[in-house]
């Protein structure tokens, strides 16, 4: 929920390093890995922190692993906050792409701009989603871009 150890400790009551170590262990073990980051306004939605997290993912060989930015809604102990603005999610997505993450998605929103999968080589639309439904899947069964042949990492 944060790339800051202080924030992670305050929100989760735990430290960040074991999470990072686990991500590295899973990656090295060949386990399919996707990272989800719930963006909480005023807590962990700082673009510098998001950029730092993305750089860590890139530096640790996770450019092909999907990164999901999820929208926060006020509940339980955080009812005083507001929902994550859509612009924040889109900016986080763009930041991650700029840093080299190939598959970046936004979720927990009805906006579909950050749901689709594109080929990182030729930008061909590969998977078209509408909220939680797949409308088009051009790589099912092959894991290859039909336009340029690039292998798309994942479980197909």
What is the predicted function of each stretch?
Residues 1-84:
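Conserved AdoMet/S-adenosylmethionine-binding subsite of the radical SAM
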Residues 86-96:
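Short alpha-helix
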Residues 116-117, 142:
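Residues immediately within or flanking Cys/His clusters that coordinate Zn2+
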Residues 119-122, 145-148:
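Short cysteine-rich clusters marking metal-coordination/redox-active sites
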Residues 125, 151:
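Cys/His-rich metal-chelating microdomains
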Residues 128-129, 154-155:
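Short, non-ligating residues that shape and space the ligands of small metal-coordination modules
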Residues 132-142:
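Short linker/helix segments within small regulatory modules
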């Amino acid at each position: 929920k944060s790339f800051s150890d202080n924030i992670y400790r305050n929100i989760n009551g735990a430290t960040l390093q074991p999470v990072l170590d686990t991500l590295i262990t899973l990656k090295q073990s060949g386990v399919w890995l996707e990272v989800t980051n719930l963006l909480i306004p005023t807590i962990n939605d700082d673009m510098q922190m998001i950029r730092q997290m993305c750089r860590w993912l890139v530096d640790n060989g996770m450019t092909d692993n999907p990164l999901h930015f999820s929208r926060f809604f006020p509940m339980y102990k955080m009812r005083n906050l507001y929902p994550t603005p859509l612009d924040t999610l889109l900016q986080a997505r763009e930041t991650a792409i700029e840093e080299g993450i190939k598959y970046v998605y936004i979720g927990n929103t009805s906006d579909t701009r950050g749901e689709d999968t594109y080929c990182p080589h030729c930008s061909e639309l590969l998977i078209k989603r509408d909220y939680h439904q797949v409308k088009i899947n051009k790589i099912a069964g092959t894991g290859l871009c039909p336009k340029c042949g690039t292998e798309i990492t994942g479980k197909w």
